[in-house]
Each structure stands twice: as C-alpha cells, then as structure tokens.
Amino acid sequence: MKRRKWLNGLATLAAACLVLAACGGNSGNNGASPSASESSPSASAPSSSGSASPSAIGGDTVKVGILHSLSGTMAISEVSVRDSELLAIEEINAKGGVLGKQIEPIVEDGASDWPTFAEKARKLISEDKVATVFGGWTSASRKAMLPVFEELNGLLWYPVQYEGMESSPNIFYTGATTNQQIVPAVDYLLENGKKKFYLLGSDYVFPQTANKIIKEQLKAKGGELVGEEYTQLGHTDYSTIIAKIQAAQPDVVFNTLNGDSNVAFFKQLKDAGITSADLTTLSVSIAEEEARGIGPEYLEGHLVAWNYYQTTDTPENKTFVESYKAKYGADRVTADPIEAGYVAVYLWAAAVEKAGSFEVDKVKEAAAGIEFAAPEGKVTIDGENQHIYKTVRIGELQADGQIKELWNSGEPVKPDPYLKTYDWAAGLSSGS
C-alpha cells in the first residue's frame, strides 16, 4: 500500500517542485548539491563483481551515475542536462527517495570525447556499482557507451533526440526518435512551401543518418536536395559553406550541426547579411540553452523542432521552470534535452518502485507502460522499444531567446525508431 501511494504521488510530484526547491537547502544528505556533484564519492565503497544490481545499494542510499560532457565542445549543451537530473534527484530525495533509499549521484565528465564516455560508463557500472546511469548527448557518445552497457547489463537513460535505427535492451530513450522530430519537421516544411533543401550537419552518426532519412523522404514527397555539407564537431569557419548556400538558393537549410559550431555558423550567417527573412533554417539541436549561448539576436525568426519548449503550456511545466530557476538562477533557461533528462530520473524511479527492486532486468520489465505527467505533457514508456510517446512541436526563435510554438502533433506520437510505418523508409534499415 505504501508503494502504491508513492507511485500515485510520483506522477504529481513535479507539481510540488517549487515547495521542494524552497526546502532543498534544508534537505540534509540528498547528495545532489551542485558543489558536491563535481567529484565522485570516496573510493572506500565496497567493490564487488557484477553489473547494476543490489550491489549499488549501500545502507540508506542507492548510487546512480550522471555522465555528460562538462568540458569540451558539447559542454554548452550538456551541463544543463546534468543540472536538471540533479534537480529531479533532489526532489525525489525530499519526498523520501526510492524504495526508502536516498539517491546518491556520482557525476562523471565525458569531456566531449567518445572513448571517454565508454571508459566512464565502465567505471560507473563496474567500480561504482551504480544502479543506473543518466547520460550522453551525441549519438557518437551513446554508441560508444552502448556495448559497455550491454556487456555489463547496465542501464542507460539517454535524454536527447537522435537518428533512430536503434533499440538497445539496455537503453531507455527519453528524447525523440526520428518520427517524433525530423520526419514531421520535413513534412511541416514541405507543406509550407519549402521544397529545396540544403542539408548542413556535423560529421558524425546523427547528422549523417538523419540526412539519409531526409533524402529518402524528399524523394518520396517531391522535395529537392540542392546541397549537403558536413563539418567536424568544433568547426568554426563557415564562410565557404555559407557562400555555397547562397549559390544553391535553397528554400531551407535543415541544420543538424551540434555543439558550439552552431555559434560560429549563425554569427557568420548574419555577418554575411543573411537573416531569417532571407533564408529559413530549421535546427534540431538548438534549443533555449543553445540560444542563450549563441545570442538570440543571431537566431530570431529561425525554426526549430522539438517536443518541449520553456513556453510549453502545462501546469507541470510552470512548476518545473520555476523550480529550475529557483535552484540555478533566474537567468537560466529550460530546454528539451534538459526536460528529457529530468523526466528520465522520474521514469526510472517509477519503474524501480513498480518493480520493487533496483535490479536492471526487473526495472526494465516494470517500465513498460509507465505514464508520467511531464512538463512537456503526458509521456508513456513503449515497452516494445524502450522509447517514449512524445508530442511533436515546431517553433520559432524569438528576440528574447524563447521559442514560440507554431505547430504541434495534437497528441503524443508512438515512437517508431526504425520507421517501419513509412513505406518510403523501407530500404533504410533492416532493424526490427
């Protein structure tokens, strides 16, 4: 009965975030203070073999890993996801923890380096004996970690939209898959008269796979590809590419650049005299946090596709935004991956309570069908592929760095990571 009451309360806990944030300074040993989060706990914790399991539990605490890029080119995006995950942990701890245990976060820096992500994931599972890990941003980091989680039977909660064509039994995907972001974004552009596409992305798996999908979609729906370019993460000179874009005269640049390359691209685009009135860009890795880093004056009028904005109108989001700002500062913003990281912690906690166990296999089994009243709206874990149902939203960046929603899907969209429901995508993957 006690567990049932906790589960019922979990779905509405986000609505109490303001109160919890206000008392956060008085919540003693919750292990989630930002200052404490930068270093791992003492290595004196007992070491035993095996993956995330009851060995993660010590006394009155259960250890979880948080693994994001806190340095390097991806830090512009990932630091704030870490912060939202720590906020969720603090809130859950203030409510009594999970199965009566306080959550103890162990934070590691992936340093925008994919082998480092794999190394740190192995450390968290094998040495720290964490029950689960919340982490990653780029698909390169996720794919580096994936074999480690599968080998050691660990559990990763990955909070960022990605290219699909994957469904690991050891990963829960709380960001959008392709049919919840990229495919509807292309449809939206085509339906609004944008037929000629220029594809610009960072040179790694997410942009490459996303653009492969987009090209098939354009062929099937009467669009036209007029250019395609890739640059390394951290690339800063876009003058040549901007000249190529001007020569190609596209209706839209579909932008899959990631990290601080977006700062250089949009500043140089404006320096070339090109504004959103001259050329539409639609980005899938720029949200409010990136707008804050780039400068909204460079982004005003450009489009984005996500599942959540700080302006999303739900009671849960109002509370989430207020709590996040109360903890981290009034100048901070929320954004889609920030919210997805926050939601991931709550979904894991709900699955643990439903399972009555921290063991990975039991948590995975219990997670299927769990619903949560998230800041973005209702989300549900799809037991078939461990992705979540999400509402699609197309938005326009405003002068203050916020995003005005222009369109949404009306209801949460079932995740289809292999695009099995799209005839034109039949040749893209043999995934099932």
Regions of interest found by a model, annotated:
Residues 20-35, 41:
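Bacterial lipoprotein signal-peptidase II cleavage site
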Residues 54-58, 62-84, 108-115, 137-140, ...:
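Extracytoplasmic "Venus flytrap"
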Residues 124-136, 157-159, 198-201, 249-259, ...:
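Periplasmic-binding protein-like
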Residues 211-305:
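Extracellular/periplasmic bilobed ligand-binding domains
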